[in-house]
Amino acid sequence: MKIVTYNQLQEAFRDYSPRDFAISRDNVFRVMRIYYNENVGQLVAFCNTQLAGRLAQFYFTIKMDLYSYKQCYNSHIFATCRNRCSSYNTFVAPGVKNVYMDKINVIKFKRNGSSFGEKAAALDKFLHNANRVHMQTPVIEGTYMRFRRAQRCRNNCVTDDARPFELERFADDFQVVNPATLTTKIEPVMACFDIETHSDGHNSSKPECDVIMCIGLAVLKDNRYDKICFVYHKELVEISGNDEYTHVVVFNNESHMIASFFDFFKYANPDVILDYNGDVFDLPYIRGRLKGDKPLLGRYDLPALQPNTKLFITKIGNRTDTYYFNYYIHIDLYKYFGADANKRDVENFELNTLSQYYLNDNKVDLNWQTMVAMYNNKQLGTMIDYNLKDCLLPIRLFNKLKLNDFMYSQCLMYRLCTDDFICNISHLISSTFFHLALTNTRTDPVTGLVVHDPYFFNKDDLGRMSSKDAGFCAGMSRLQRKRIPLKDLPANSIRLGAINEIVNYEGGKVLQPRAGVYEFAFSLDFNSLYLTIMIDICACLTNLILCEDGNVYLNQDKQAINVQLLLQLLKQRSELKKCRDSQTDSEFLYDLYDQMQNLSKRTANSIYGYYGIFCKLLANYITRVGREKLTAAIGMIEGLSNDAELLSKFNLSTLTFRVLYGDTDSTFVLPTFKRDEIPEESCMVTLTRICAAVETRVNGLFANGYKMAFENLMSVLILLKKKKYCYINSANKIVFKGWLVKKDMPVFMRVAFRTAIEQVLRHQDLQKCLDSLLINMLMYFDAFGTTKPLTDYSFSMTYNDGAGKVTENESRPTKRRVVTVARHCREILLNKGTDFVPGNGDRIPYVLLDIQGSVTQKAYPLRLFDPRTMRISWLKHMTILNTFMNELLEIFGDEHTSALNKCYDAILTKYMQHQAYDKKRVTLIKINAAYKRKAPSDDAARKRARAGPSALRKQKAASNDEDSSDEDDEDCSQAIGSNNTFKFSLYKYK
C-alpha cells in the first residue's frame, strides 16, 4: 500500500494493456461488449484477445443501420401503403390459417437518425440496442471470432487499411469461431468499486451534507488483482504498507476525487464493472455529491457518456433505477442474488453472508462508527483495507459462480445482451419469442419445402390479455380479435374456457399424505411433465383461437413457434449434456457446455410459468392435463400390486404398491412385501431392481412422450404433510424438503431440530431424537451471548415499503400505515445512525426483547442488540419449538405424548427461567373434531374464488418471503387418518 498522486497512478497504468500490436488471421478474439451509436449509425465492438500469454484489448467499428418496428395506422385502402409497411400475423391469438388471420401492419425504421418520439413508440422498446444488434447481425456478445486478414491495432483501435468494416461485407472481414475448437477461454477484465461515506456518528449518511471518505476499486486481469483507493481528506495523511499492487491516491477536493475515479476507468479498462447494492446506494449517493449530475465515463478515445438509467421492478414490486454504463458492462451483484430463486439457501443477501457461504471468507471487521472516528483521526489504513476487501469479494463471488459463462450463454442462445444480466425470465422469453416470430419458418405440407412464415410479437397484447382492471370487457376479449365461426375451427381444437373470463391460477395435483415414518419408499417422477404436456397439446400463443361461441380454443398446430422452440431446447440440452460429459481434458469446455445445458433447462421449464403470468387459461389447461397424468400414474402404479410377472421375476409371494404422496409430477410409493423373502444384505439391490421394473411397466402404458423415472430409493422417509418431508436417499445422504429449511427460523433451532430428526432417520428411535433435541437446545441456551454468534439466534423479515404501484383507476389507501416488525427495526436503525440501513427487499435480522408490549414493539435489530445489557425474549423461539413438538406428535401419535411432553417441559423450563414478561407453560389439549384436517368443501373453494386476485397476490407475496410453495391445490378426496388426537399449546403463567 503506497500513496501516489493521480498523475503517478495514470503513469503506472499507462502500459497496463498494450495499445499497439498486430493481430494475425490465426489470433482468436472475443467480443466482450457492444455499443451502438445511433447518432452516426456505427457499431462499436469491444474485444479481448490473448497475445503471447498476455491479455490485449481493442475495439473496432462497423458502419451499419439498426432497425426498430412501429405500428402503421394508415387506412390501407390501396394495394400499397405510402409508409411501406409490412403485414404480419399477430403472435397472440391470430386465428385460423386459410380462414382468417389477424394482422398487424408494421413499419421497419432506422433508429439512427430517427426522432425520440419514434423510438418511444417502437413496438420493440423493451429491447436494448444490443439485443437488436444480436438479432440483426452475426456480432453477438460472447462470440469468438477471427479477422479474415491480418490487422494492426493502433491506439487500441483496429481499422482495416484497405476499407472500413461494413455489415454488408461481414463474411469477407470476419470469421465466427466455434468455441468447441478452442482449448482456453478469453476472460473479460473485471472491476468492482465501493464507497465509504462520512456521518456525524448518530445519523445515517446523507449526500446533502456528508462527504464520501473514499472510493475503492479492485481490478482483476490476467489472474492478478490491482487495488486502488481514492481518498478524500482535507489534511495531509500518511499510510504505511508495502503492497506494490495497492495504490492510494489522496485528494483534498472531493469533486476532484470523484472525477478522477471515473476518469481512471480509461486506464484500468475493465469490461465488467461490478458493485454491491450500487444502484440503490453508491451511484445515487455519488450523484447526490455531484448535485444531481450523472458522472461521465469514457473508454479509449471514444467520447465520454453519462450512464443511462432504467426502472427496475422486482417480483414483489420494489422499484429502483438500474444504471447502464454504455461502453462497459455494469452489474449490481446484489440485484442478481435478490432476483435469483436458486440462491435462497443463504440466510440473507448481505455481502458478508454470501462471502462466508460461497467463499468461506469474510469482510474486514470494522463497524461504521469506528471507521468514521478513524477517518477523523487520520488513521486510514484499516478503513482502506475494509473498503478494498468489499471490492474484492464481489469479483470473487462472480467468478466462483461462473457468472461470466452464464451471462454470455444468454447472449449466444437467446439474443439477450450483457445489460440483461439481471433480467427476469419473462424478459428472456419475450425477447426470444420476438426474434423467433420474425424468423419463423414452417414446412409446406404439399411441397415439403421450408418456407418463411413470420409473425409479429406485440408485447402490448400480453398486457391486454392478462390485465385485471375493471372495464367493459375482461379476459382475452380485450384483444379485440375477430371471432372465428365455430364451423371453421380445426376438428382437434381444445376448448380452454370463456373469452371474457378473469381466470385465477390453479396449481398441480397434491395428495395429502398421512404423517409417519416409512421404510423402503421410492420416488417415481415424470421427466419434464409440463414441458411434455406443452409439446403434446401444442401450447403456443399462436395456436389460440377466439371463437364466435364465446370460448377460447387451442389449435393443434405442431409447427407452432413455441412447440418448435421446446423441441429444439430438448434436443439442444441432450446434445450439450453429451458434449459436457465428453470433456475430460478441457475444464473450459466442460463449464461452457454445462452452463448452456442448464440455461436450456431453465428456459424450457419457465415457459409454463410465463403462461401462468400472461395466459392463465392456457396455463390452467396444462395444469389440468398434469393432474390427469399424475392420477393416471397413481392408478398404474397401484395397479401393479401383486402383478404375476413381478411376483415371478423376484420370487415373491406378495408385493403391493401404495402411493403415499403425490405432488404435481412426482409420487412416493411404498412397496409392501414379506421381509423374510428378501435377504437383508441384498434388500436395497433387490428393491432397486423392483423400482426399475415398475418404471419400465408404467412407461409402457404411457404414450406421446410421457415418461416417468425412478429417482430415489429411500431407506427411511419421514412424511409430515404436503411439501414437508425428509429422507435418506440412495447415496445415504439426508435430504430435507420444505421442512426445517425456512429462513424465518433461527439457525440454532434449525440445527437442533434437524439433528434430532436425523436420529429418527438413522436409527428409527424417537428417544434418541428427544435426547438429541434436549442436549442441543440446552447447549445453545448456555452458549447464548458467549461462544455462539448472535446471528444463530435471530429471526429475519423482509422490508417492503411502498411495493407495487397504484394505477390511475385505483384510489390510494387512506387507512393508517401498518408498522411491521421490519419497518419498526429499520426505524430504530435509522435513529441510531448505523452504517447500513436496509432498503426495499432486504431481510432485517432481529430478536425480541423481554419487555412489555406487542411482538412488533419487542422487535429489536440484531445489529444493535447487546446481550450484556439487554434481555432477550424467548417467546417466539418457544412458539417455533411448540410447532415442532406438535409435528413430532403428528408423526408418532398419541402413544408417545408422555415422552414428548417430558422433553418439551425440560426445554421450556430452562428457557423461561429468567423471563419477566414472556413466561409460558405447556399444556396438552384435546383436538376438536372440527380442527382436524379435512377435504376442502365446495364452500371453501367458492370462498377462494371470491377472494379474487388481491388475495392471490398476497398469498404469492407471502410465499416469496417465506420460501413456501403452497399455491398448489390439495387433493383430499381420500380420507386421511391422523395419528394424534392431542396437541401442545403454550399458555401464560397466571
From Swiss-Prot:
E.C. code: 2.7.7.7
GO biological process, alphabetically ordered: DNA-templated DNA replication; viral DNA genome replication; viral genome replication
Sequence segments annotated as region (Disordered): 936-976
Biased composition (Acidic residues): 960-972
Gene Ontology MF terms: DNA binding; DNA-directed DNA polymerase activity; nucleotide binding
SUPFAM superfamilies listed in its UniProt record: DNA/RNA polymerases (SSF56672), Ribonuclease H-like (SSF53098)
Signal peptide coordinates: none
Role played: Replicates the viral genome, host DNA polymerases cannot substitute for the viral enzyme in this process.
Family of this protein: Belongs to the DNA polymerase type-B family.
Designated name of the protein: DNA polymerase
Originating organism: Choristoneura fumiferana nuclear polyhedrosis virus (CfMNPV)
Organism ancestry: Viruses, Viruses incertae sedis, Naldaviricetes, Lefavirales, Baculoviridae
The gene coding this protein: POL
